[in-house]
Design a protein with these regions (language model features):
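Alpha/beta-hydrolase-fold serine-hydrolase catalytic core, especially in secreted/extracellular enzymes
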Residues: 1-146, 154-171, 178-226, 248-252, ...
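Short His-Asn-centered micro-motif
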Residues: 151-152, 175, 231-233, 256
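Gly/Ala-rich beta-loop-alpha elbow adjacent to hydrolase catalytic centers
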Residues: 229-240
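Aromatic pocket-lining residues of Rossmann-like dinucleotide-binding sites
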Residues: 243-244
Length: 332
């Protein structure tokens, strides 16, 4: 327990006495002046064992996948299917929302002189979390309009109405996934939530991917968009990648400054994801769907390029200088 009380301490001591000593007498004092000698508390006589591997246990106890890039189009598609099967069977067993979330209300958030309008969609997820998704409507000639969806970053400060710098004629959906917006948590509660979700075979980022998908499905049910693209910047780039992998109606992915590896403690944690592959490997399973990189693709992500080239889709890996420069890729 994180907090002790005299009543709790006495109960603990009585349990120890009963089961370790066979002593049934009641404990009357929860504090003692007895100090155990340090030599009685030392483990391994105060010296760590030679060749201690505990500090690297995460690297070898459960072997990590080390995939080799496929070399032919057919091999690339087979490899992709294997990756998707593994991710859905291990890491994302219950992530995709099979049922539409319950729509609570749609609030009009006003507009601008240029014709831009905003709506806030309040919805409830399958596990009864009430969230908000902010739809920014940008007038344009294209019908139906493209839609760019993103998960709100926990680092984003609360503002009156979120927005996304997309091109004219492209609508944007910013989803306040759990832990952001109205459900933002302080550092202590955030860490507690991370631990609790793992107790039930989930993780906070995995639940955020669920929220992102739920909002996307909700909007698609009520509005018509083509194409639907998902965007992730920095720490939220993995959310975009995995949301698209789980939902084939998301036709394009846009990433900016993605993390280099899931082994970085600052990268979103997804249970057992490294048994399938690292982020750069799993992102390559998006083939043949287009991926647009804002800025430059990190050199460490060369595996992604190799897979797309092997599949004959190298032209579907694009780069743009800014998100506002993104336009749909004509690939189908």
């Amino acid at each position: 327990p994180h907090g002790y009380t005299p009543k709790l301490r006495k109960a603990i001591f009585e349990w120890f006495n009963l089961h370790l000593k066979g002593d049934t007498s009641p404990v009357t004092d929860d504090v003692t002046d007895v100090v155990e000698p340090e030599e009685n508390l030392l483990v391994f006589e105060g010296n760590l064992p030679e060749n201690d591997r505990m500090k690297t246990i995460q690297e070898w106890f459960i072997p990590m996948a080390t995939p080799e890039p496929p070399t032919t189009p057919s091999d690339a598609m087979t490899w992709r299917d294997d990756v998707l099967s593994s991710l859905k069977g291990i890491t994302f067993q219950d992530t995709f929302p099979e049922q539409l979330p319950r729509l609570c209300e749609v609030r009009t958030a006003g507009g601008t002189k240029s014709g831009q309008r905003g709506e806030t969609w309040v919805f409830e997820t399958a596990d009864a979390i009430e969230l908000r998704a902010h739809l920014v409507l940008n007038p344009g000639p294209r019908t139906p309009s493209p839609l760019v969806v993103c998960a709100q970053s926990p680092d984003q400060k609360r503002i009156c109405y979120p927005s996304l710098s997309v091109a004219e004629g492209t609508d944007a959906l910013i989803v306040d996934v759990r832990g952001t917006g109205a459900t933002a948590m302080g550092v202590g509660m955030h860490d507690t939530a991370r631990r609790l979700y793992m107790n039930i075979g989930q993780s906070l980022p995995e639940r955020q991917v669920h929220d992102l998908l739920a909002a996307t499905r909700l909007i698609q049910h009520h509005r018509t968009y083509a194409p639907v693209a998902v965007y992730g910047r920095g720490a939220m780039a993995p959310h975009a990648v995995y949301a698209a992998l789980l939902d084939e109606t998301i036709e394009e992915v846009i990433i900016e400054a993605p993390p280099l590896t899931h082994q970085d403690p600052n990268t979103a944690e997804f249970l057992a994801v490294l048994q399938t592959g690292d982020l750069k490997h799993n992102a390559a399973a998006l083939v043949p769907r287009p991926i647009t990189v804002v800025g430059a693709l990190p050199a460490e992500w060369e595996f992604l390029t190799q897979v797309y080239q092997a599949a004959g889709c190298g032209d579907r890996l694009r780069t743009v200088d800014s998100l506002s420069a993104w336009t749909p890729c004509e690939w189908q």
